[in-house]
Amino acid sequence: MTLTLAHYLVLGAILFAIGIFGIFLNRRNLIILLMSIELVLLAVNMNFVAFSSWFGDTAGQVFVFFILTVAAAEAAIGLAILVLLFRNLNTINVDELDRLKG
């Protein structure tokens, strides 16, 4: 059995749906929210690589590196906010983010 473009797209759609489901299901825990966003970005990257490989163009694979760079910066900023929230309030609840003003 050979893997076709449809197999990769279905896997990307499943990962994307799990990520969106995680975002909507758990909006209070910041760690789960960040992991769900990263899962959505992983699904998008998988689709870029699948289309790039299928059509023989390397532009999609190069674009994935830019997305991974932005995702790493987003994760670093999100984790910095998480550490700040936990140090000040001893919680990682997203509802408490409005207390970090100042």
Curated annotation (Swiss-Prot):
It catalyses: a quinone + NADH + 5 H(+)(in) = a quinol + NAD(+) + 4 H(+)(out). Keywords: Cell inner membrane, Cell membrane, Membrane, NAD, Quinone, Translocase, Transmembrane, Transmembrane helix, Transport, Ubiquinone. This is NADH-quinone oxidoreductase subunit K. One of its GO terms (cellular component) is plasma membrane. InterPro entries: NADH_UbQ_OxRdtase_chain4L/K, NUOK/Mnh_C1-like. NDH-1 is composed of 14 different subunits. Subunits NuoA, H, J, K, L, M, N constitute the membrane sector of the complex. The chain crosses the membrane at residues 5-25, 31-51, 62-82. NDH-1 shuttles electrons from NADH, via FMN and iron-sulfur (Fe-S) centers, to quinones in the respiratory chain. The immediate electron acceptor for the enzyme in this species is believed to be ubiquinone. Couples the redox reaction to proton translocation (for every two electrons transferred, four hydrogen ions are translocated across the cytoplasmic membrane), and thus conserves the redox energy in a proton gradient. It comes from Bordetella petrii (strain ATCC BAA-461 / DSM 12804 / CCUG 43448). It is a multi-pass membrane protein.
